[in-house]
Curated annotation (Swiss-Prot), chains A, B:
Sites where the protein binds [4Fe-4S] cluster: C66, C70, C73
Pathway: Cofactor biosynthesis; biotin biosynthesis; biotin from 7,8-diaminononanoate: step 2/2
Biological processes annotated in GO: biotin biosynthetic process
Domain of life of the source: Bacteria
Species of origin: Geotalea daltonii (strain DSM 22248 / JCM 15807 / FRC-32)
Subunit details: Homodimer.
Domain Radical SAM core: 48-278
Protein name: Biotin synthase
Gene this protein is translated from: bioB
Length: 329, 329
């Protein structure tokens, strides 16, 4: 069944959906046969989310000592890695990093903490205070990624001015046991629902190259669609020494782009941002991510790995004739 | 007149031509509207010349002291630049560089000499001897670029085993007087004809970003089509201190890609290789050149500027799932 991507693109643009079997078939495309898939993804993106690029940055506000055993993670206490270990940074530092992110042109700034959840009381309060100051003193939109949360914490974050809560599913339901055995997938799914119920937008995606199959990547995309998340961060594994996946084979650039395009077709109206592992996995093909359907990218450093200088990303966007979305678009 | 690029691509694939006015209209496309143009160029390229990439390298065998006043050229005696000045390198060196180029994966190796023409007698003989040795001792195909030549020189090169003669028109007939006033455009056109008549294939293209208009770029493409050259090297100006164009504004990456695509549509069956100025002008978009219709690229250093390491180009080709054409394909 040779897919007519023009027609499929039009169907999705007119509000129709892509079927799982169609996505699985598109997953078999290779080499230049992928170009029409990218073309369709690009048209769908522009139709639903426009052609501006959304930039975001993060701060690793609390690092290491995580009791979870996620196979890829340098911050897991189950791994011996060089990832820094420190407790929650102070409010001043959170606000200073927000200013730095704004200076770099990011519209969204994520405060990320390692660990299954943050401790109620002092830790949550310090973050909420920082969010309030960031709201008052900068033009950047603060978001938080504090692990598994309940309604009380979610409401506190809303009250402090958090707009978006980030919590990844990391992979598909069927592959998750291969990634993490210290908590259940449904706890992550539930965190997404709790955050939405409290009135937060949800930024939820995952990481590819963990050993999952293409079908499992597609499975994850459909789960995100069911949960109706608001933005989807896509990471590509940057194997870190000391983790279970230190010797994992890198996902190829064209496979990264194919994954982005499939997510765009399955999640046509969502913000899809390319985050961790972009430079490492895409190399010379980084400039293809927007053609493949992404509408945003993280700039600056990642959680435990460094990103390239923001100026290089800005030059790439200029070279692509792409402009940057300002904050709340 | 909104061009249907699908239909235009099919017309060209079926042997039809693109009209000048159609090319001029495509020259107005900007941003993501260029993606379908690249898609059409890519399909046309694959139809006529396949999806393998042709790699070539050159040696600057005689440098500087050129009496011509080409505005872009660091080797012109009319300019004060840092370009090295040396007479014709010896046969041993020419052969050694051929081996280096072969090691880098190039299928074609160009022996280039500055100056209006090379001197008959000793200079020509030394080059012909080197060509004979390169033929015997390596698997790479030697080509020559020795300026304006007559039938006698062309025949000597054929006899020595040269397959392709390189001689650029540099720009369009109408813009040429702005580039060079020390010789006439028709001398270059005639050199192409002389070489073809002697049984040589001809590699003939030019350089963009000299101040020419888009229409003049298109004009040059149609002149090359009339001359029925065999391969078309496209260079993008890398402004060199001391030349008339030292402060020229760089042509943008998308303009470079648009030019490549237009040349593919106008010269559908030809080998189109991206040469000088690729890294400088295309930056993160170097990986788009083949999608835009190019079927080859120069690797290693250029005449008077350095190229990036061959390994980086090989990684880019691998990442694009593109394989390299072996020598005489």
């Amino acid at each position: 069944m040779k897919m007519n991507l023009e027609k499929l693109g039009e169907r999705i643009i007119e509000g129709g959906d892509i079927l799982v079997e169609e996505a699985l078939e598109l997953a078999n495309l290779r080499g230049s046969a992928l170009y029409p898939l990218f073309g369709a993804a690009s048209r769908i993106k522009e139709h639903f989310v426009g052609d501006k690029v959304f930039l975001c940055s993060i701060v690793n506000a609390k690092s290491g000592r995580c009791p979870e055993n996620c196979s890829f993670c340098a911050q897991s206490a189950h791994h011996k890695t060089d990832a820094p270990v420190y407790s929650l940074i102070d409010e001043e530092r959170m606000v200073a990093c927000a200013r730095e992110a704004e200076k770099n042109g990011s519209s969204c700034y994520g405060i990320i903490t390692s660990g299954t959840s943050i401790k109620k009381g002092e830790e949550l309060e310090r973050i909420c205070n920082a969010v309030r100051r960031i709201r008052r003193e900068t033009g950047i939109t603060p978001s938080c990624s504090l692990g598994i949360i309940n309604h009380e914490t979610a409401s506190a974050l809303v009250e402090a001015g958090v707009e978006t809560y980030h919590h990844n599913l990391e992979t598909s339901r069927s592959f998750f046991p291969n990634v993490c055995t210290t908590h259940d997938y449904e706890e992550d799914v539930n965190t997404v629902r709790v955050a939405k119920k409290a009135g937060l937008k949800v930024c939820c995606g995952g990481i590819f190259g963990l050993g999952e199959s293409v079908a499992q990547r597609i499975e994850m995309a459909y789960t995100l669609r069911e949960l109706d998340v608001d933005s989807v961060p896509l990471n590509f594994l940057n194997p870190i020494a000391g983790t279970k996946l230190e010797n994992a084979e890198n996902i190829t650039p064209m496979e990264c782009l194919q994954t982005i395009a499939l997510f765009r077709l399955i999640l046509p109206t969502k913000r899809i941002s390319i985050c961790g592992g972009r430079e490492k996995n895409l190399r010379d093909l980084q400039s293809w991510i927007f053609f493949a359907g992404a509408s945003g990218t993280m700039i600056g450093n990642y959680l435990t790995t460094t990103g390239r200088a923001a100026e290089e990303d800005w030059q790439m966007l200029k070279d692509l004739n792409l402009s940057v979305a300002s904050c709340c678009e």
